[in-house]
Amino acid sequence: MADNFNFELVSPERLLLSEMVTEVVVPATEGEMTVMANHAPTMTTIKPGVVSVRSASGKKQDYVVFGGFADILPTGCTLLAESAVPVEELHKDELTRRIEAARKELEHAELHEHKSRLEHFIMELTHLRGIVQQD
């Protein structure tokens, strides 16, 4: 049986989750990471994607995050998201709205680095839209 550790998922709007868990899968910018108790101390940036949380009771919960960073310690993990919602609360039309807003910003972007980041963000949101279920 896996050891438990404290996990918090925080966005500017609210604290989405604070509980003991056995496993958290985060969409780190360098690749998907599975965090468990006694993980080596790590800080990583988070890209838009799905965070999967397995609670101490065995229940699995998924959340959509739109970037941020995670602070991982042997005793816990805190994920500070730019924006986050439970996956069942997010609809494809919201993702489409975010994609269109990023495309409009891309039209007016002048710096190559800014354009490149926006193009990558649009690609990540488009992929995310493909995995979020429509009600």
From Swiss-Prot:
Its main location: membrane. Keywords: ATP synthesis, Cell inner membrane, Cell membrane, CF(1), Hydrogen ion transport, Ion transport, Membrane, Transport. Pfam families: ATP-synt_DE_N. CDD domains: F1-ATPase_delta. GO terms for cellular component: plasma membrane; proton-transporting ATP synthase complex. It is a peripheral membrane protein. One of its GO terms (molecular function) is ATP binding. It is found in: Cell inner membrane. Produces ATP from ADP in the presence of a proton gradient across the membrane. Belongs to the ATPase epsilon chain family. NCBIfam families: ATP_synt_epsi, PRK00571.2-4. F-type ATPases have 2 components, CF(1) - the catalytic core - and CF(0) - the membrane proton channel. CF(1) has five subunits: alpha(3), beta(3), gamma(1), delta(1), epsilon(1). CF(0) has three main subunits: a, b and c. This is ATP synthase epsilon chain. It comes from Rhizobium etli (strain ATCC 51251 / DSM 11541 / JCM 21823 / NBRC 15573 / CFN 42). The gene is atpC.
